[in-house]
Regions:
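Glycan-processing catalytic domains of CAZymes
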Residues: 1-167
Length: 167
């Protein structure tokens, strides 16, 4: 869904990145163990794929220069996974709608799309990085299928309502 107050930004602009780096410093100073970077797939709407890799890598470098064990978890944008610099920058990856909902709420994604995403995600598990998959099934049958396929691929799954208002 379109979340109220959620909108794309020109993440490749230095002024915007300065804001994020300032927040990263505050997060570190507060003592959090890491950050969960949502909307990493924004490059799919705006272009600038290489700039997104660079941005995530810069966030990671800044954070890890202050605390080596600080976690960087990226959500979505699995087209970035083949990039070695991106893989090096992140500690874990989360993917929404791997099996259902890519094109229409509750609709099964194409076999080709699933196969390609799984191939990319397994590049991370081969490096020992956890992969989380969040599915928003419409019914119990979809939930059951999603649990099985997520488990079969050795991913960590969450079945939830899209509103994320309950676990």
């Amino acid at each position: 869904p379109q979340w109220r107050g959620n909108y794309g930004v020109r993440f490749w602009h230095s002024d915007w990145q300065a804001i994020i780096f300032e927040y990263t410093d505050k997060i570190l100073a507060t003592g959090f163990d890491g950050v969960y970077l949502d909307k990493v797939d924004e490059f799919e709407e705006m272009g600038h794929k290489d700039e997104m890799v660079e941005f995530v890598a810069r966030i990671a470098a800044r954070a890890k220069s202050q605390r080596a064990d600080f976690m960087i978890v990226s959500q979505n944008g699995d087209a970035l996974i083949p990039n070695a610099r991106f893989r090096k920058a992140i500690d874990a990856f989360a993917r929404e709608d791997l099996l259902y909902g890519e094109n229409a709420e509750g609709a099964r994604n194409s076999a080709a799309s699933i196969r390609e995403s799984v191939r990319r995600l397994k590049m991370l598990t081969a490096e020992g990085k956890p992969v989380f998959v969040v599915e928003y099934p419409r019914n119990e049958e979809q939930a059951k299928t999603a649990r099985r396929e997520i488990s079969d691929n050795k991913f960590i799954g969450l079945i939830a309502k899209r509103a994320l208002d309950q676990l």
